[in-house]
Each structure stands twice: as C-alpha cells, then as structure tokens.
C-alpha cells in the first residue's frame, strides 16, 4: 500500500498509509490538488496546526478506524446522542483536558468527522448534568460576573431551570 509523509508543526515526520491519511478530508483534498492521489511522494505534507504528539494520536485513531464506514451526514432534526461512544474510543480519549482539546482542534483542522464527533461528545459528557459552578471547576474557568450580573442572567434564563 502506498504511503505518505506527514510533517507536524514541530517538524516530526510520520510515514502513513495513504488510505489512512485520507480519512482526513483536508489531507485528501491536498493530495488531489497536488496530483499526489495514490502514488505517494517523498515530500512531506506539512500540517502546521498539529504538533507531533497530537498527530501521533490522530494517526493512531485513524488506523484503528480505517475500515469504518463513512460517518452519516448530520441530520439537523435528529437529536444528538452522547452515550454512543465506542469502548475503544472511550479508552483512547482518557487523556488530560489539554490533549482532548488539542485533539478537537486537530480533528476540526484535518476535517476528520468521526474523531471530531467522539471528542466533542466526550466534552459534552463532562458538562452534562453539572451546575455552572461544577462546569467552571471542571474546566478551570474563572467566574467574572459580578453578583448583580449573575442575578440578572439567572433571572433572564429562569425558564431553563424549571422542571
């Protein structure tokens, strides 16, 4: 199987099967635009927005999911679920918050829908059922509202909390 070289933002080069790399719509489009469709090339494809540690994780995820069917198109009317993350992905995403957020940014930049979906669902699950104070604590967010501002926001959004 032909391979391609991917270069991370910090200069590390990864040799990857072309079919695995093409799970990224961004890389697939680059290869098509450069006329490097399947024959491979010695010049690495630069990925200036992804460092080596994160690119290594992305390649690991893509390798595991190489035989998956393409993810379905989003249906605007369909309710989004966050309880359908495969066990392998749950284990794979047991990383620190910084790494998780870097994976979201990389999946978005590289346009890998399946990875973007599971990383965002993981963050959604970290938020689900928590109070604003618990969410702030989880994500180390400083509350910069004055007491008056907070009271005003609570008043305006009171309907949200009614059960």
UniProtKB/Swiss-Prot annotation:
What are the Phosphothreonine sites (modified residues) in this protein? 131
| Species of origin | Rattus norvegicus
Which PANTHER family does the protein's record reference?
A: SKP1 (PTHR11165)
Quaternary structure per UniProt? Interacts with KDM2B, forming heterodimers. The KDM2B-SKP1 heterodimeric complex interacts with the PCGF1-BCORL heterodimeric complex to form a homotetrameric polycomb repression complex 1 (PRC1.1). Component of multiple SCF (SKP1-CUL1-F-box) E3 ubiquitin-protein ligase complexes formed of CUL1, SKP1, RBX1 and a variable F-box domain-containing protein as substrate-specific subunit. Component of the SCF(FBXW11) complex containing FBXW11. Component of the SCF(SKP2) complex containing SKP2, in which it interacts directly with SKP1, SKP2 and RBX1.
* Function field: Essential component of the SCF (SKP1-CUL1-F-box protein) ubiquitin ligase complex, which mediates the ubiquitination of proteins involved in cell cycle progression, signal transduction and transcription. In the SCF complex, serves as an adapter that links the F-box protein to CUL1. The functional specificity of the SCF complex depends on the F-box protein as substrate recognition component. SCF(BTRC) and SCF(FBXW11) direct ubiquitination of CTNNB1 and participate in Wnt signaling. SCF(FBXW11) directs ubiquitination of phosphorylated NFKBIA.
Output the InterPro entries linked to this UniProt entry.
SKP1, SKP1-like, SKP1-like_dim_sf, SKP1/BTB/POZ_sf, Skp1_comp_dimer, Skp1_comp_POZ
Q: Which UniProt keywords apply?
A: Isopeptide bond, Phosphoprotein, Ubl conjugation, Ubl conjugation pathway
Family stated for the protein in its record = Belongs to the SKP1 family.
Q: GTP-binding: present as a keyword of the record?
A: no
Stretches for region Disordered? 63-83
Q: From the UniProt record, give the pathway where this protein acts.
A: Protein modification; protein ubiquitination
One cellular component (GO) term of this entry: cytosol
The protein here is known as: S-phase kinase-associated protein 1
A molecular function annotated in GO for this UniProt entry is: protein domain specific binding
CDD domains for the chain: BTB_POZ_SKP1
Q: How is it modified after translation?
A: Undergoes autophagy-mediated degradation in the liver in a time-dependent manner.
Report any Pfam family annotated for this entry. Answer: Skp1
- Tell me a GO biological process for this protein: protein monoubiquitination
